[in-house]
């Protein structure tokens, strides 16, 4: 653990985590559903950081967001999310109501940036210079970047001080073309010239580790400052590993 993370664990001040959402909400699926932020990726990690006493800030490059329609109907969390998102006084809804614009935030204020998935990432992150600049400056502070599923492409489109992608020569995981087939979106992605993170990572020299199983099991890879999860079921685990790294405990 580096000095920055040790200090966060020892101080009485709450460590701060930034949830960085993609800002796209619009058409994607063949059946007419829109994509955006995966609500499961957001909610599962939010619970972990909140329960461990982190100060949570939510932002996107534009200050806008929308939830992926299909993720909001995920049967694994539908009952819980219905109660959460119908309550304007819950902590998550209050944070979302006050979502910040990324260019108004200081990267050095945070010890973790957590990026939830959703196919909106493929529309947003390859072109969002504000996101790329923020992540570059945050990475230089030695903070931890957590990314899940489609969000991992942000690591491929952000360069470090050497001009290489953040994930070049790093062990990472994320969605593969098999996952896109499983999700029924491969034809859509081909039509839009979108690529899976696995394809992108291998083409820029990342050390991509494919998950042995989709859906059922989480699959998490840590390498230095990068904590990546292969799928939505990895969101909770990625957040927990980042908490352990910052607070230096084995719980």
Swiss-Prot record:
One of its GO terms (cellular component) is cytoplasm. It catalyses: methylglyoxal + H2O = (R)-lactate + H(+). GO terms for molecular function: glyoxalase III activity. It is found in: Cytoplasm; Nucleus. This is Putative glutathione-independent glyoxalase hsp3105. Keywords: Cytoplasm, Lyase, Nucleus, Stress response. SUPFAM superfamilies: Class I glutamine amidotransferase-like (SSF52317). Belongs to the peptidase C56 family. HSP31-like subfamily. Its EC number is 4.2.1.130. Its main location: cytoplasm. One of its GO terms (biological process) is cellular detoxification. May catalyze the conversion of methylglyoxal (MG) to D-lactate in a single glutathione (GSH)-independent step. May play a role in detoxifying endogenously produced glyoxals. Involved in protection against reactive oxygen species (ROS). PANTHER family: GLUTATHIONE-INDEPENDENT GLYOXALASE HSP31-RELATED, PROTEIN/NUCLEIC ACID DEGLYCASE DJ-1-RELATED.
């Amino acid at each position: 653990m580096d000095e920055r993370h040790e200090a966060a664990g020892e101080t009485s001040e709450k460590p701060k985590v930034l949830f960085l959402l993609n800002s796209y909400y619009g058409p994607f699926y063949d059946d007419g559903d829109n994509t955006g932020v995966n609500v499961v990726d957001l909610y599962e990690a939010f619970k972990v950081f909140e329960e461990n006493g982190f100060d949570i800030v939510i932002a996107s490059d534009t200050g806008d967001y929308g939830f992926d329609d299909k993720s909001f109907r995920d049967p694994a969390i539908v009952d819980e999310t219905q109660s959460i998102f119908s309550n304007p006084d819950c902590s998550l809804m209050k944070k979302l109501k006050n979502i910040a614009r990324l260019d108004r935030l200081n990267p050095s204020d945070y010890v973790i940036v957590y990026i939830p998935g959703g196919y909106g990432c493929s529309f947003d992150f390859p072109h969002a210079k504000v996101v790329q600049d923020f992540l570059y400056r945050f990475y230089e502070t030695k903070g931890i970047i957590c990314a899940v599923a489609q969000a991992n492409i942000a690591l491929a489109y952000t360069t470090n001080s050497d001009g290489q992608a953040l994930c070049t020569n790093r062990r990472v995981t994320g969605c593969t073309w098999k996952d896109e087939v499983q999700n029924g979106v491969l034809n859509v992605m081909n039509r839009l010239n979108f690529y899976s993170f696995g394809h992108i990572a291998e083409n820029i020299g990342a050390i991509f580790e494919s998950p042995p199983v989709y859906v059922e099991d989480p699959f998490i890879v840590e390498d230095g400052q990068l904590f990546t999860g292969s799928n939505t079921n990895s969101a909770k685990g990625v957040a927990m590993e980042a908490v352990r790294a910052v607070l230096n405990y084995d719980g």
